[in-house]
């Protein structure tokens, strides 16, 4: 069985979709459906089983071999996390993101099960250069980023002793289908689309930290491309480590808004004041250094913002 934690969430459900497209339906989704709206991400997917995240963790900790799943666990894609960068309950974040990840990690390395997990570019904090997979470049701005940084450090410490595949992927700004449940944490493309559909103009922040209006730049990566990187590592088990998962391109928010306007054929960008509560806690620029990922042989192209947002708009407004 293929286990996808966070499988009803944004990236997890897209990963299940790609697995289905490859003919794999022996997939177990682990999630927390307290937010019942997430079920819509699973409706059009074929899975073999569903299990609540707490039950799964309890069985992992007890050393359960999941004999009811034919052949046990083949691989764990660990996408489940509290991904709200605005969540400041550190105890909750550390339990869900750090302790849970450690439990899965030890279960996998003891049994030599491939473990591919979601890290985050939030580990880099507010820097404007050197987004390189090295602890000296990591300085997160929020407790979410810290929980991801700490787990990366934990994995790095164990790496020399591990005999099976362990891969951490530092996701940059991911956008695309199946993120509607994320509310304020959904991508800029999602929110701009909602604004235009309501008859409003798409709104971007005014300039701040030396960036012009709408000119803050991020490495925006389409969710399909993120899933392809995950699946490539699973098919190339000789590679382990922590890798950036971006495009290597920084594009301004302006490009996202223009792609949304182009799809709808209406609207003009409106600039709003930069919120005080985000000053000093906001990544104004991100750009993945792709040297390490390209160095292990990943050579697929990544969609530009214009290409990815066009695809996404077609899906959202279908």
UniProtKB/Swiss-Prot annotation:
GO terms for molecular function: ADP-glyceromanno-heptose 6-epimerase activity; NADP binding. Substrate binds at residues 173, 184, 191, 205-208, 218, 282. Gene3D superfamilies: NAD(P)-binding Rossmann-like Domain, UDP-galactose 4-epimerase, domain 1. CDD domains: ADP_GME_SDR_e (cd05248). It catalyses: ADP-D-glycero-beta-D-manno-heptose = ADP-L-glycero-beta-D-manno-heptose. Pathway: Nucleotide-sugar biosynthesis; ADP-L-glycero-beta-D-manno-heptose biosynthesis; ADP-L-glycero-beta-D-manno-heptose from D-glycero-beta-D-manno-heptose 7-phosphate: step 4/4. The active site is at 144 (proton acceptor), 182 (proton acceptor). Keywords: Carbohydrate metabolism, Isomerase, NADP. The keyword NADP applies. The keyword Transport does not apply. Catalyzes the interconversion between ADP-D-glycero-beta-D-manno-heptose and ADP-L-glycero-beta-D-manno-heptose via an epimerization at carbon 6 of the heptose. Contains a large N-terminal NADP-binding domain, and a smaller C-terminal substrate-binding domain. Homopentamer. This is ADP-L-glycero-D-manno-heptose-6-epimerase. The gene is hldD.
């Amino acid at each position: 069985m293929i286990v996808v934690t966070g499988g009803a969430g944004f990236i997890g459900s897209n990963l299940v979709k790609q697995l289905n497209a490859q003919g794999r339906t022996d997939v177990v989704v682990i999630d927390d459906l307290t937010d019942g709206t997430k079920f819509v991400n699973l409706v059009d997917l074929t899975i073999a089983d569903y299990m609540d995240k707490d039950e799964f963790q309890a069985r992992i900790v007890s050393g359960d071999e999941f004999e009811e799943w034919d052949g046990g666990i083949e691989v764990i894609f660990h996408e489940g996390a509290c991904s709200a960068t605005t969540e400041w309950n550190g105890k909750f974040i550390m339990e869900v993101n750090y302790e849970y990840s450690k439990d899965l990690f030890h279960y996998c390395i003891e049994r030599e099960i491939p473990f591919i997990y979601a890290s985050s570019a939030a580990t880099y904090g507010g820097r404007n250069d050197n987004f390189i997979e090295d602890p000296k470049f990591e300085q997160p701005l929020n407790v979410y980023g810290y929980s991801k940084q700490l787990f990366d450090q934990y994995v790095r410490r164990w790496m020399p002793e591990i005999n099976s595949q362990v891969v951490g992927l530092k996701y940059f700004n991911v956008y695309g289908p199946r993120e509607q449940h994320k509310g304020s944490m959904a991508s800029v493309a999602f929110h701009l689309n909602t604004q235009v559909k309501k008859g409003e103009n798409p709104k971007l922040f005014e300039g701040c930290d030396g960036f012009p209006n709408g000119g803050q730049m991020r490495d925006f990566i389409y969710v399909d491309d993120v899933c392809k990187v995950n699946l490539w590592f699973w098919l190339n088990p000789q590679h382990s480590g922590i890798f950036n998962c971006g495009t290597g391109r920084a594009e301004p928010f302006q490009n996202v808004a223009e792609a949304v306007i182009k799809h709808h054929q209406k609207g003009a960008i409106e600039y709003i004041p930069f919120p005080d509560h985000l000053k000093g806690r906001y990544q104004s620029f991100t750009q993945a250094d792709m040297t390490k990922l390209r160095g292990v042989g990943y050579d697929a192209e990544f969609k530009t913002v214009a290409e990815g947002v066009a695809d996404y708009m077609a899906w959202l407004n279908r």
